[in-house]
């Protein structure tokens, strides 16, 4: 089988779409290496995160030929369709970025995934409107539409008027580095390297308004053990400088607060294991669901904002909070009782078996084969 992907955002961006595309294609390449996976993009962009993916023998990248002047038109029109057919592509998979209009009416097997069905993380309302318009067209073209969770599935059905039988949930998988073992002496080395406190709760992500960082700080501040700090891993933003730093002063957390710009990817699993817990104060976006899965697989206690999405992904292996003080009490109970902590971590580990690369690859290959079968039946 040869699968083509709309790879513009995967190659040129470092966002939720790019991350999902990388882990999906990596999972497929590892578990079904006899297939070929071709990423199509109008332009090339240096992206270090793609190095491991491009090292897979079954992964290829294709761009429009040099004589084609309007490369974006090639990507969104008939050009990419001709290229895909010429490369023997059996199924085309668009991820967030729409599906080329040239596939419309062709009965070409197509699949479309939306990591954020309403595109709330788009850069402004104009970009959001354009992305929703592309998604609406893609839903009409695609033979199967993929959501990452049941809430998003219902949103796709309601907002884009897609038939329920045509929308399927395919959960993402955890990052394969989460399974790496960490030598005991590495913890102290990393503590000195990144100047980390002895006991801390870790937040990893963007330091923006929508991340509910004040709630994260207030929850850590309310813990019964006042020697536990919060470490925020992410680059400083205007919101951080104007709001977060002021909140640190307001609740007197100067000595219990640490911000780190960047931790090397190879060190991230170890830092998660060092943390008393990983806190995820917003669970409404794809990136937050990735965090839950990765933190659980890394062996960290996970506490996250309560939501239907969070409970679907986190299962029995996480602490869910709506109220800051109740959340602090629940986390304190777990951290103070080794039996409760061990039971939670065991449940988290068992929960992540739903999110292995093999499970993701098997599910997606089943979908690719089903749309291919649908095409053959239609032709007969």
PLM features: what roles do these ranges have?
Residues 1-380:
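Carbohydrate transferase catalytic cores enriched for Leloir-type hexosyltransferases
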């Amino acid at each position: 089988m040869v699968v083509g992907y709309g790879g513009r955002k995967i190659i040129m961006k470092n966002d939720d779409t790019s991350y999902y595309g990388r882990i999906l294609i990596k999972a497929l390449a590892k578990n079904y290496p006899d297939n070929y996976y071709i990423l199509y993009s109008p332009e090339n962009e240096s992206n270090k995160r793609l190095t491991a993916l491009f090292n897979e023998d079954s992964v290829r990248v294709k761009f429009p030929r040099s004589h084609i002047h309007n490369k974006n038109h090639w990507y969104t029109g008939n050009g990419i369709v001709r290229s895909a057919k010429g490369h023997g592509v059996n199924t085309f998979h668009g991820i967030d970025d729409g599906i080329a209009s040239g596939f419309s009416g062709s009965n070409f097997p197509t699949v479309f995934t939306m990591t954020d069905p309403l595109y709330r993380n788009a850069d402004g309302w104009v970009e959001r409107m354009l992305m929703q318009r592309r998604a609406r067209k893609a839903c009409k073209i695609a033979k199967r539409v993929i959501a990452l969770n049941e809430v998003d599935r219902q949103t796709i059905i309601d907002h884009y008027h897609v038939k329920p039988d045509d929308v399927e949930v395919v959960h993402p998988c955890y990052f394969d580095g989460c399974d790496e073992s960490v030598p005991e002496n590495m913890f102290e080395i990393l503590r000195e390297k990144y100047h980390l406190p002895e006991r801390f709760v870790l937040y990893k992500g963007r330091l923006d308004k929508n991340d509910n960082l004040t709630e994260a700080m207030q929850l850590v501040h309310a813990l019964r053990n006042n020697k536990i700090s919060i470490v925020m891993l992410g680059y400083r933003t205007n919101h951080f400088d104007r709001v977060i730093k002021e909140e640190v002063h307001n609740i007197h957390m100067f000595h219990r607060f640490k911000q780190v710009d960047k931790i090397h990817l190879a060190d991230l699993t170890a830092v998660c294991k060092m943390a008393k817990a990983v806190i995820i104060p917003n669970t409404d976006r794809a990136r937050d669901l990735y965090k839950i899965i990765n933190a659980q697989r890394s062996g960290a206690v996970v506490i996250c904002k309560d939501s239907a999405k969070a409970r679907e992904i986190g299962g029995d292996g996480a602490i869910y909070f709506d109220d800051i003080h109740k959340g602090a009490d629940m986390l304190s109970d777990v951290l103070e009782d080794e039996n409760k902590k061990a039971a939670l971590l065991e449940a988290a580990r068992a929960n992540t078996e739903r999110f292995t690369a093999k499970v993701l690859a098997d599910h997606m290959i089943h979908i690719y084969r089903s749309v291919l079968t649908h095409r053959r039946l239609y032709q007969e």
